[in-house]
Swiss-Prot record:
CDD domains per the UniProt record, alphabetical: NT_GlnE_GlnD_like
GO BP term, pick one: regulation of glutamine family amino acid metabolic process
Region feature (Adenylyl transferase): 449-951
Provenance organism: Yersinia pestis
Protein name according to UniProt: Bifunctional glutamine synthetase adenylyltransferase/adenylyl-removing enzyme
Length: 951
């Protein structure tokens, strides 16, 4: 055993003092002091439970003692009579055994592979013991779940990730998926429940038993987000539902996750065999699957983006050459060849790497290097986490913890340990880069760049610039020169370091070579400089633009076309990662894919880290808006599709925000008890305005109204129980908070809830009955106009049907036409007086006469006027399809409907493009004359009055 360095000797003295103050001070041996000095977790536990130290002396930890964990746990649970006692027993058992594992790990009486086995078996034993105990309790309370033949049904649990691979780290989440074989009902209970309800309740109680923080801590953080549909999906699925999902909707990333999936408990009963056989074809293809290469390239890029996004430094898991890359290398062979090579279907990494060597897929020396690096990194990770039982993979920067890790890894000091670590990670990186065969970065020097070096490195006169920009006017050339000079001056005032300066000197001539030949070179460069100033001290992004010429060209193209995009990139440089794949950049996601893509994005963020979750939501929105804007700028997306994509994106984010708020509220208060007998969450969100009408723009806010379905006497079922309706009020407040909180990536959306019943004076959340009553008896005509553009964007099928029925009933009421005309007209005049342009030489596309708002009012008036006789007019909430319906049902001529639609789309298109230019909706007074004349004619026809025509 190495002598303790000075930092640990000081720590040892402090520990001796603390143990000497115990009622019966133990006799500490040298090895005891070494472990206690290395791990605050172990020393804290043994101070609370000094008898565990005596046990360590009497029964020292053995490498193979994991075989007895289940037996020991059964003894610990033998006297447990209720759930509170179960939670206490599980937590104490976990702490006791984790102390033993940390002890043998530090003293190296167990190897790293054995430590991983111990940690994984401990988790599995506790999951299964808790499941079995709770299953019996649930059967007594609710009856036994049976299939249609009366055969009892079990809960099967898939351990994912490192748990599934038997490679759990010291302080880790556990990723689980719950399943049961067949649908049916409970038997022997007071009333029948279907199996889905039974297993959902069992699953919820199991998660609580493992995950809930008590005075004794917790057992494991449980992450259920890998299940089908993630947080928005059922907690437990039948085999049939699982099979349908993976056959019809399983994504590549879910296939990768399934490689390590393992049934907890090691059972080999028919149900377990059936589930394994069902999943195998999804994971391992029968043919050699080279189609996976591109997906793996995308994953490689995702790793790099993740490191940049989270600002990860010194991270031994996600950093270059880290644990994740070794796992990735191993999965490449499993996914490509695993269907035909059973030896590659191992879940554990080291045996799979050995099979890779035996099959000749990698040189033996590389496999040996990878295996050695993996064991080195996993031991380092476990020692790091054992310091305080914290889930971290970031190396410390304080001398004490650096000394702990260096000593624990067998090195004299931190410098020696760091050198060994660097060598291991470099060896991994070499294999990782070779294996995926990513496109070679374009780092060659274009000969033409030499012409532009002097433009960056020398102080030039205007006459010197003329040969490089012969097409520019003198004024534009002067502006270009001033921009370069100003940027050079700004850079000189910043600390960018020698590497940053070197990369910037490579980048600027390349950038000038692309920008200077452009006819708008002066404008383009002024926009690009804003971005460069934001990243000039962040060498990673400068390197990205140097190494990937295509990315540089995309930046120039987009920033030149849109100052909005330029300012977004300048504020949030992590969006530069989106430029690496031009195919996805100019092709936004399929409308149905936003929810799934966001779900994957959020999976990379700890579920309980609200700050990171908020950041991730905002970063996802910005990245997707950039892709939509790119499609808009290049005319790959017409105006209607731009709004469709912005609306689908908003709906996906609404869904995720509600999920996050719901999880937080349920963790605090439990869920309203009436939900145990009903589908859904008793909560709905109505989208009004541009969201409701599928007409969102780049900077649109969200008009939302919250509805609930909850009886009066309901309470939540958590330890801190509150009134059910109070729960929904706080849920809505939480949702508003998550949208509006300003992080380093800004806010998510501005949310306006003033269209709710009684406006700002009304309750933030209304019951569905109160909403219906208000619409019937108190709402103004303008509120019914707003209802034309309203639709449900979140809620159960029941609430969906209820809202649609209320909306149709209200819109189909008989209305006296003269009065309706007058009320619609008066509201429009009031808006125009308040919002319209007061300047004769300006036309406001939105607010002035003949503009978009007039078109919207015509559509709303026609629905309110004619829906009583033709209820099908209420089907759509967007203006274009409303006009189509008016023509279809012979209320408006096809020619007029088409003309209004053309005017509407043309003006909407201009507003989108003005937004990309960061300009308002005000244009010259002689704009859109033909469109405005058509709108004025239709306004006069339908809402006849002495309304001012378009001049």
């Amino acid at each position: 055993m190495l002598p303790l360095p000075s930092e640990l000797q000081i720590q040892a003295q402090s520990i001796k003092q603390r143990f000497s103050e115990l009622p019966a001070p133990p006799d500490l041996r040298d090895e005891d002091i070494a472990v206690l000095a290395l791990s605050d977790f172990v020393s804290d536990m043994l101070l609370i439970h000094p008898q565990w130290l005596e046990e360590l002396h009497q029964q020292p930890p053995q490498p193979q003692e994991w075989q007895y964990y289940s037996q020991w746990l059964s003894q610990a649970l033998a006297g447990v009579q209720d759930e509170a006692a179960l939670l206490t027993a599980l937590r104490l058992f976990r702490r006791r055994v984790m102390v033993r594992i940390a002890w043998s790990q530090v003293l190296q009486t167990s190897g790293t592979a054995e430590t991983l086995q111990q940690l994984s078996t401990l988790a599995e034993s506790m999951i299964i013991a808790a499941r079995d105990w709770l299953y019996q309790v649930c059967c007594r309370e609710l009856g036994t779940p049976c299939n249609r033949q009366g055969v009892p049904q079990p809960l099967l649990i898939l351990g994912m990730g490192k748990l599934g691979g038997g490679e759990l780290n010291f302080s880790s989440d556990i990723d689980l998926i719950f399943a049961y074989p067949e649908n049916g009902q409970t038997q022997g209970g007071r009333r029948e429940l279907d199996n889905a309800q039974f297993f959902t309740r069992l699953g919820q109680r199991l998660i609580k038993a493992l995950d809930q923080h008590t005075i004794d801590g917790f057992v494991y953080r449980v992450d259920m987000r890998l299940r089908p549909f993630g947080d928005s999906g059922p907690l437990v699925l039948s085999f049939a539902a699982l099979e349908d999902y993976y056959q019809e909707q399983g994504r590549d990333w879910e296939r990768y996750a399934m490689v390590k999936a393992r049934l907890m408990g090691g059972a080999d009963d028919p149900y377990s065999q059936e589930l394994r056989q069902m999943l195998r074809p999804f994971v391992f293809r029968r043919y050699i699957d080279f189609s996976v290469i591109q997906s793996l390239r995308n994953m490689k890029g995702m790793i790099a983006r993740e490191v940049r996004r989270r600002g990860l430094k010194d991270n031994i898991k996600l950093g270059a050459g880290g644990i994740r890359e070794i796992e990735f290398i191993t999965q490449v062979f499993q996914l490509i060849r695993g269907g035909r090579e059973p030896r590659l279907q191992e879940r554990a990494l080291l045996p799979t790497l050995q099979a890779v060597a035996e099959l000749g897929l990698l040189p033996e020396q590389q496999v040996a290097d990878l295996s050695g690096s993996y064991l080195f990194l996993r031991r380092l990770e476990n020692l790091l986490q054992a310091i305080a039982d914290e889930q971290t993979q970031t190396l410390p920067n304080d001398p004490l913890n650096q000394a702990r890790l260096a000593w624990g890894m067998g090195y004299a000091d931190w410098a020696a340990m760091s050198t060994a670590l660097e060598n291991h990670m470099q060896a991994v990186r070499v294999v990782f880069d070779d294996l995926i065969g990513d496109e070679t970065p374009d780092i060659g020097e274009d000969p033409s760049h030499g012409l532009y070096k002097s433009l960056w490195q020398d102080v030039l006169e205007e006459s010197d610039l003329a040969p490089l920009t012969p097409h520019l006017e003198e004024a534009a050339r002067r502006q270009l020169l001033a921009t370069i000079s100003g940027f050079r001056h700004d850079v000189d005032k910043r600390t960018i370091g020698p590497r940053g300066r070197e990369v910037l000197d490579q980048l600027m001539p390349r950038l000038f070579a692309e920008v200077c030949p452009r006819p708008d070179a002066n404008v383009a460069l002024s926009r690009l400089i804003l971005l460069l100033l934001s990243i000039v001290t962040r060498t990673t992004y400068l390197e990205l633009l140097v190494e990937y010429h295509a990315a540089l060209k995309h930046v120039i193209r987009l920033c030149s076309a849109s100052p909005m995009v330029a300012s977004q990139l300048a504020r949030y440089p992590l969006l530069l990662d989106e430029l690496l794949d031009p195919q996805s950049l100019y092709q936004p996601l399929a409308p149905s894919a936003y929810r799934d893509e966001l779900r994957q994005y959020l999976l990379r963020v700890p579920e309980d880290d609200e700050e990171q979750q908020l950041e991730a939501l905002r970063q996802f929105k910005q990245a997707q808006q950039l892709r939509i804007a790119a499609g808009d700028i290049t005319e790959a997306l017409p105006v209607m599709k731009v709004s469709d994509h912005l609306t689908y994106l908003a709906e996906a984010i609404i869904d995720a925000v509600i999920q996050q708020a719901w999880n937080q509220m349920v963790a605090r208060y439990g869920q309203p008890s009436h939900l145990q007998q009903s589908e859904g969450r008793g909560f709905a969100v109505i989208g009004y305005g541009k969201l409701g009408g599928w007409e969102l723009g780049y900077s649109s806010d969200l008009d939302l109204v919250f509805l609930l379905d909850c009886p009066l006497d309901v309470m939540t079922d958590g330890d801190r129980s509150i009134d059910g309706r109070q729960f929904y009020l706080r849920l809505a407040q939480r949702i508003m908070h998550l949208f509006s909180t300003r992080t380093s990536s800004g806010i998510l959306y501005e949310v306006d809830a003033r269209l709710r019943p009684s406006g700002e004076a009304g309750m933030l959340v209304s019951t569905i009955e109160a909403f219906a009553d208000y619409q019937r008896n108190e709402a103004w005509t303008w509120e019914h106009q707003a209802l034309v553009r309203a639709r449900i964007v979140y809620g159960s099928p029941k609430l969906h049907q209820q809202f649609d029925a209320i909306r149709q009933q209200i819109l189909c009421r008989h209305r006296e036409d003269p009065q309706l005309q007058q009320e619609v007209r008066e509201m429009r005049e009031k808006m125009r007086n308040h919002l319209g342009s007061k300047q004769r030489d300006i036309f406001d596309i939105k607010a002035d006469a003949g503009g978009i708002t007039d078109i919207e009012f015509i559509a709303q008036y026609l629905v309110l006027r004619y829906a009583a006789s033709e209820p099908r007019l209420t089907r759509w909430s967007d203006n274009v399809r409303i006009f189509e319906s008016m023509a279809h049902y012979d209320i408006m001529s096809p020619e007029e409907a088409a003309a209004l639609t053309r005017a509407y789309v043309t003006m909407r298109d201009e507003i989108h493009h003005l937004a990309l230019q960061e300009q308002s909706s005000k244009v010259a007074a002689d704009s859109f004359i033909a469109e405005r004349e058509q709108v004025a004619a239709s306004w006069h026809k339908w809402l006849a009055a002495n309304d001012a025509n378009v001049s």
